[in-house]
């Protein structure tokens, strides 16, 4: 008897599992709030060079600014430069700051970076890290780098938590993730310098990676196979809830320190709920901890209410299951590249996942040039994720996985690319295209999880998902840095996001369709699929899945 059969006997889907999903909802809500926090935390409000005070006998502030600030090619006053000497204006006495009256320099007036710092418009944000440490103009790269540092921490933390959770257990490491996220989040909010904030934010990313790695297995390892997809879709709605909740919290709290505290403190009730979160019985059996597994399985059976025979949960039966679980060899990433067909699938999936993450976070973090304020835009971006999931559900059933994957990525690429052609004055069109880009990128994210899981054989499914998620996190960490390309050409970041999404869409078309296909069980099953003979495919020992 295997663990799946054992789980069927105690109830693979019932009150016990539903309670578990509810208890593990909090980490899924917290993740998007931290992942997308730079939208508010690192926002750059309108700013200009700090200037000397307007003289008492001069009432025209616009003329005062005109005398001190040069204009950009688009006609706006410069946010990063000021004239070395104020320019003379008709019928004014401004000329002469720092020089004798009548001594006007010849040629083009010289400019300098803001020597006295910047003045910020605080109507939308009372305080951000950009206003706190003047991360604008020549220092704007440091502002964008915060997101990259954070995602780099997630990248490293995912590997660390993956190893430690297999060794020390899911529940114990989830406690570590909660406590470390709380401590490092508080430290980030108390940062007194940019360096301190960058370090603590990177470590916070490492801590939060525990949620991404542990929560899903802790849910799925208590669910039977039939209900895992339903639970996965239900859990994904918690992410959408977190995206929308962030918009509300950001609107109510305009100071970055208090905002960071607000999205961090829910870790406290999360720690308390761990008392009711069960450890994975499957993991306990692989570690030979039969008594603990027996206790959790009995608790599951009592709560779900199915009749369980004494023989099913006897120590002898559990010892046999434990022995069978320990005999399963733990695969490595190298196993994904040992055979031609599997290597081909893995390389294609890596490109697709990089494109999905790169475009999703690129679109999500780029709210510039839209007609709505940042809070309403974020709320709309969150709300549009729900119909996106419905779109995926309908499309994968009728058009198939491959076309849905390619189509959603192509839609994201077109929406982002068309924004380049829209003039800055056409705010409504730019906003509509941005919302469409977010909808398609979210749909691509949802499809990627389903499609990838069906491409890999059972023996390597988790390993394959782990590799593609790793590459995806790399794409997510690079997406904020791509925004710096606007220094070369204003539309270059959008071209990068759209171009990578288009490349991923083309790559998705190279993958095999899995709609109404049999899930491969072994590596040999995957390799046989490359053979042209349909007879070989019919003979493959694979199980049928409903589309």
UniProtKB/Swiss-Prot annotation:
Name of this chain's protein: Solute carrier family 22 member 7
Similarity comment: Belongs to the major facilitator (TC 2.A.1) superfamily. Organic cation transporter (TC 2.A.1.19) family.
Species of provenance: Bos taurus (Bovine)
The encoding gene: SLC22A7
Coiled coil start-end: none
Catalyzed chemical reaction(s): orotate(out) + L-glutamate(in) = orotate(in) + L-glutamate(out); 3',5'-cyclic GMP(in) = 3',5'-cyclic GMP(out); GMP(in) = GMP(out); 2'-deoxyguanosine(in) = 2'-deoxyguanosine(out)
InterPro entries assigned: MFS_dom, MFS_sugar_transport-like, MFS_trans_sf, Orgcat_transp/SVOP
The protein's role, per its UniProt record: Functions as a Na(+)-independent bidirectional multispecific transporter. Contributes to the renal and hepatic elimination of endogenous organic compounds from the systemic circulation into the urine and bile, respectively. Capable of transporting a wide range of purine and pyrimidine nucleobases, nucleosides and nucleotides, with cGMP, 2'deoxyguanosine and GMP being the preferred substrates.
Record keywords: Cell membrane, Ion transport, Membrane, Transmembrane, Transmembrane helix, Transport
């Amino acid at each position: 008897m295997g663990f799946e059969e054992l789980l069927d006997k105690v109830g693979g889907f019932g009150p016990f599992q539903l309670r578990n999903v509810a208890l593990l909802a909090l980490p899924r809500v917290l993740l998007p709030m931290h992942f997308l926090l730079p939208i508010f935390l690192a926002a750059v409000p309108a700013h200009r060079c700090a200037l000397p005070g307007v003289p008492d006998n001069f009432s025209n502030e616009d003329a005062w600014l005109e005398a001190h600030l040069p204009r950009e090619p688009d006609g706006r006053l410069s946010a990063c430069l000021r004239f070395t000497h104020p320019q003379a204006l008709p019928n004014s006495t401004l000329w002469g700051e720092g020089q004798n009256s009548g001594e006007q320099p010849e040629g083009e007036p010289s400019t300098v970076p803001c020597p006295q710092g910047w003045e910020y418009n605080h109507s939308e944000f009372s305080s951000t890290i950009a206003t706190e440490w003047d991360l604008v103009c020549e220092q704007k790269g440091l502002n964008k780098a915060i997101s990259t540092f954070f995602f780099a921490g997630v990248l490293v933390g995912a590997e660390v938590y993956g190893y430690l959770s297999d060794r020390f257990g899911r529940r114990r490491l989830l406690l570590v993730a909660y406590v470390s996220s709380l401590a490092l989040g508080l430290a980030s909010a108390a940062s007194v310098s940019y360096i301190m904030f960058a370090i603590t934010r990177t470590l916070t990313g490492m801590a939060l990676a525990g949620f991404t790695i542990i929560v899903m297995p802790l849910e799925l390892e208590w669910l039977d196979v039939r209900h895992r997809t339903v639970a996965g879709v239900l859990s994904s709605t918690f992410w959408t809830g977190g995206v929308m909740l962030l918009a509300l919290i950001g609107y109510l709290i305009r100071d970055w320190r208090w905002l960071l505290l607000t999205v961090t403190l829910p870790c406290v009730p999360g720690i308390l709920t761990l008392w009711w979160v069960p450890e994975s019985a499957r993991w306990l059996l692989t570690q030979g901890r039969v008594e603990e597994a027996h206790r959790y399985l009995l608790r599951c059976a009592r709560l779900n209410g199915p009749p369980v025979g004494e023989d099913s949960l006897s120590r002898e039966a559990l010892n046999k299951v434990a022995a069978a679980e320990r005999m399963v060899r733990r695969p490595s990433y190298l196993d994904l590249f040992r055979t031609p067909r599997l290597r081909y699938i893995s390389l294609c999936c890596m490109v697709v996942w990089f494109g999905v993450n790169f475009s999703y976070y690129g679109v999500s973090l780029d709210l510039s040039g839209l007609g709505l304020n940042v809070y309403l835009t974020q709320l709309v971006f969150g709300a549009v994720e729900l119909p996106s999931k419905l779109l995926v559900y309908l499309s994968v059933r009728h058009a198939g996985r491959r076309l849905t994957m390619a189509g959603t990525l192509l839609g994201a690429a077109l929406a982002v690319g068309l924004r380049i052609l829209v003039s800055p004055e056409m705010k409504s069109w730019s906003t509509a295209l941005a919302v469409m880009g977010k909808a398609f990128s979210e749909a691509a994210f949802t499809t990627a999880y389903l499609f990838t899981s069906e491409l890999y054989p059972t023996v390597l499914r988790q390993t394959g998902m782990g590799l593609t998620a790793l590459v995806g996190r790399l794409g997510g960490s690079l997406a904020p840095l791509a925004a710096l390309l606007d220094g070369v050409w204003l539309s270059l970041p959008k071209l990068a996001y759209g171009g990578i999404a288009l490349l991923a869409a083309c790559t998705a078309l190279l993958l095999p369709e899995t709609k109404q296909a049999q899930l491969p069980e072994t590596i040999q099953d995957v390799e046989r699929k490359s053979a042209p003979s349909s007879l070989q495919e019919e003979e493959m020992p694979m199980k049928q899945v409903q589309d």
